[in-house]
Regions:
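Local cysteine-cluster metal-coordination motifs and their immediate loop/turn environment
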Residues: 88-100
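Short, glycine/polar-rich helix-capping loops at beta-to-alpha or helix-loop-helix junctions
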Residues: 90, 175-178
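N-terminal, well-ordered alpha-helical segments
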Residues: 79-83, 92-95, 113, 117-120, ...
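Core AdoMet radical
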Residues: 100-115, 122-148, 154-175, 182-208
């Protein structure tokens, strides 16, 4: 089993971490850089609204490396998570989203096996204690949600991963898939950016 313990994290930049993972090919690391960048706009797993660097005579800072976010475990500990998207492609064109279909930005997709391997490699090297995973919607909400569930399921059942997992529920996914995700994730969250129907029609006309 991958047994969790409490390492003294050295918050290195994403590139420094990746340079030390020799088993990963360059293509996977390029995709990871793109998808970690896209994931940073999801504020549900942000350290705080404050950017505060280390100062002489003071301990700590609020700035982690690329692809790393801070969250709080059930026991109150602040833990470091690999924060990444499965893909930043999306069938929707929501005006509020950086990853909307019409936006001109680098796109990438990690396979389930690639993301599982990345998580395990980072975890074994004590750079993270868990995973925060979200995704753009590809093909359909259920197709996308099923892939998120497969990542969590493979981590738990195949690799005996005992770290923290936070999954973002895909809007429109079936209740069955969301329930299955809850079997493997420590935390599930959903986006509620637009509480009124008229605002939804204005900003995301393809959703209902």
């Amino acid at each position: 089993d991958l047994v969790r313990y409490q390492p003294a994290f050295r918050f290195k930049s994403y590139i420094c971490v990746c340079n030390q993972i020799g088993s990963m090919n360059e293509n996977v690391l390029t995709k990871l850089k793109i998808l970690a960048e896209s994931a940073k706009y999801d504020v549900s797993c942000a350290s705080s609204g404050t950017v505060r660097s280390n100062k002489p005579g003071m301990l700590g800072n609020t700035v982690g490396g690329w692809g790393i976010c801070h969250s709080f475990a059930e026991d109150g500990r602040c833990i470091s998570l690999l924060k990444v998207m499965l893909t930043n492609y999306c069938i929707y064109d929501c005006a509020y989203c950086i990853n909307r279909r019409s936006n001109d930005l680098p796109r990438a997709t990690l396979s389930v096996s690639e993301l599982v391997e990345l998580t395990i490699e980072f975890y074994r090297r004590n750079y993270i204690e868990g995973l925060f995973l979200s995704s753009g919607v590809v093909r359909s909400p259920d197709y996308t949600m099923e892939r998120l569930v497969r990542v969590a399921k493979d981590l738990r059942q195949v690799h005996r991963f005992n770290g923290y997992i936070h999954l973002k529920s895909i809007p429109g996914a079936s209740r069955e898939l969301v329930n299955e995700a809850g079997l493997y994730a420590d935390r599930l969250s959903v986006n509620v950016e637009i509480p009124k129907e008229e605002n939804l029609k204005l900003l995301a006309p393809e959703k209902d």
